[in-house]
Curated annotation (Swiss-Prot):
GO biological process, alphabetically ordered: carbohydrate metabolic process
Any Pfam family hit: Aldose_epim
Taxonomy, superkingdom: Bacteria
InterPro entries: Aldose_1/G6P_1-epimerase (IPR008183), Gal_mutarotase_sf_dom (IPR011013), GH-type_carb-bd (IPR014718), LacX (IPR037481)
GO molecular function: carbohydrate binding; isomerase activity
Stated name of the protein: Protein LacX, chromosomal
Length: 299
């Protein structure tokens, strides 16, 4: 099912499959969101839950209060992105989707939960709020959540990928960890200098020749994708997320993904117990945790 929100600036669409954003068009009909061309990547803006990235061998180990250690299988980016969400509510400027675990999810993730995703259209901005409720009455629930929106790049016909830059809200000097595409894991100790006293990064396909770029030490809480020719662009604000992942495929795809994540793939030096992973969010019984990010069209 497709749902549409519209105001004087934007027309935005969503679908119940994955509970995700599927289109952002301005008043001139220019599409900003990647449209899932399978030649390059058939995704658009999947929701990553209850993990971001990969676990070691896809296994999560739990230390729950009511049983011995337990191992569950959770594949890359979690299990909700290809599931059907329930459409809870639609009004003039917002839409709410929700999902609860099925039997297969509970076999591998030991917690009853409800994930609600609230999208709000306000002017030229779309806010995505993730509301994660722990439905357990006694167990604290660990989780990670992330967004994976991909944007057309170039946005305008006649422009090239290399005509675009990323602009950070702060001057940045940071390194990035080594990644292992074959396993999805990271080595947080083996790092390569990436940004050196700069606020912008010119895009080039060579950036993604190895893998995604994990920015886990950014000071900036927003990043802007902008054409140096037409000025067309958008901004992603991610105050609630400590990490930003930059990604495109290695075959010169006409998109870039700007991904706020609450956690990272498993690193070589950490263990497999989900509750002990760095940056894990823990929700008390019957409590709700909320995280949000914004996409703003700039023209």
């Amino acid at each position: 099912m497709t749902i549409e929100l519209k105001n004087e600036y934007l027309t935005v669409q969503f679908k119940t499959l994955g509970g995700q954003l599927t289109s952002i068009k301005d008043k001139d009909g220019l599409e900003y969101l990647w449209q899932a061309d399978p030649e390059y990547w058939n995704g658009q803006a999947p929701i990553l839950f209850p993990i971001c990235g990969s676990l070691r061998n896809d296994w999560a180990i739990y230390r729950p209060q009511d049983r011995p250690f337990f191992t569950g299988l959770i594949r890359r980016h979690g299990f909700v992105r290809k599931e059907e969400f329930t459409l809870e509510e639609v009004n003039e400027n917002s839409v709410t989707f929700s999902i609860k675990p099925n039997a297969e999810m509970l076999d591998n993730y030991l917690y009853q939960f409800e994930l609600r995703v609230v999208y709000t259209l306000n002017g030229k901005s779309i806010r995505t709020e993730f509301q994660v409720t722990n439905l357990e009455t006694e167990k604290t629930m660990p989780y990670f959540i992330g967004a994976h929106p991909a944007f057309n790049c170039p946005l305008v016909e006649g422009e090239k990928y290399e005509d675009y830059s990323l602009e950070f809200s702060e001057v940045e000097s940071c390194s990035i960890p080594k990644s292992f595409p074959e396993t999805g894991l990271l080595d947080l100790q083996d790092r390569t200098p990436f940004l050196e006293n700069q606020k912008s990064l010119d895009l080039d396909y060579s950036l993604f020749s190895h893998d995604a770029i994990t920015l886990d030490r950014l000071k900036s809480r927003s990043v802007t994708l902008r054409s140096r020719k037409s000025g067309k662009g958008l901004r992603v604000d991610f105050d609630d997320f400590p990490n930003l992942i930059l990604w495109s495929t290695s075959n010169k795809s006409p998109f870039i993904a700007l991904e706020p994540w609450s956690g990272l793939s498993t690193s070589l030096e950490e263990g497999n117990i989900l509750e002990d992973k760095p940056q894990v969010t823990k929700v008390l019984p019957l409590d709700t945790s909320k995280k949000s990010y914004d996409i703003t069209i700039l023209n």
